[in-house]
From Swiss-Prot:
Protein role: Heme-binding protein able to scavenge peroxynitrite and to protect free L-tyrosine against peroxynitrite-mediated nitration, by acting as a peroxynitrite isomerase that converts peroxynitrite to nitrate. Therefore, this protein likely plays a role in peroxynitrite sensing and in the detoxification of reactive nitrogen and oxygen species (RNS and ROS, respectively). Is able to bind nitric oxide (NO) in vitro, but may act as a sensor of peroxynitrite levels in vivo.
Domain notes: Forms a 10-stranded antiparallel beta-barrel structure able to accommodate a hydrophobic ligand in its interior. In fact, this fold hosts the heme group, which is located in a wide surface cleft.
Gene3D superfamilies, sorted: 2.40.128.20
Record's cofactor remark: Binds 1 heme b group per subunit, that coordinates a highly solvent-exposed Fe(III) atom.
Named cofactor requirement(s): heme b
GO terms, molecular function: heme binding; metal ion binding; peroxynitrite isomerase activity
Native source organism of the sequence: Renibacterium salmoninarum (strain ATCC 33209 / DSM 20767 / JCM 11484 / NBRC 15589 / NCIMB 2235)
The UniProt record lists the keyword Metal-binding: yes
Residues annotated to bind heme b: 190
Protein name in UniProt: Peroxynitrite isomerase
Amino acid sequence: MPVEIPRDLTPELVPLSWLLGQWEGQGRLGTGEAESEHFFQRVTFSSNGLPYLEYVAESWLTDEEGMKLRPLSVEMGFWALDRKLGEADGGPGLIPADIVPALTTADDVEKLRNDTSGFDITATIVHPGGISELYYGTIKGPQIELSTDAVMRGAGAKDYSAATRIFGLVNGDLFWRWDVAAEGNSLEAHASAILKKTAAPESAEQRPSE
């Protein structure tokens, strides 16, 4: 399946472009054994013209036939190539980026390839319950591997100390697995799912404006 790239996508997001769009499908909690609970998930990756992807994942518990039973969770965050930010980049806060992006050509992006011919990436993901994760990892073609570098927990949050996530595009479907270290346990299977693309990515020009 060809990857549709919005015409206004900033060059440094091209390695991540296969994630763009809306994805939906079924998953299983834990190891996926017979007693593991089922869930439905809707994931959206979008771009607003800046050098990161916005990420939202909504999940619902379901019965074995896929009928939604009740909301399960929501998480959201930002994904980007991992590089040192400079004067052309926006932030912190509301400091605007330059009109001309830091990386303007495919050659600029190619210089960021790592020793495995992929790209280093970072993702920040926030959960309900006072938990925020900072991931570092790599993307190589349609495969992503992420590991937490830091987990921030609020005073009342449950124990959650580390996580890994893997994503892959297989025959047009998005496969993912999430392992976590929580409640005093070491890393173990937490959830996995297979999602199908249900909506193509929008360009920044198509997104609603005030």
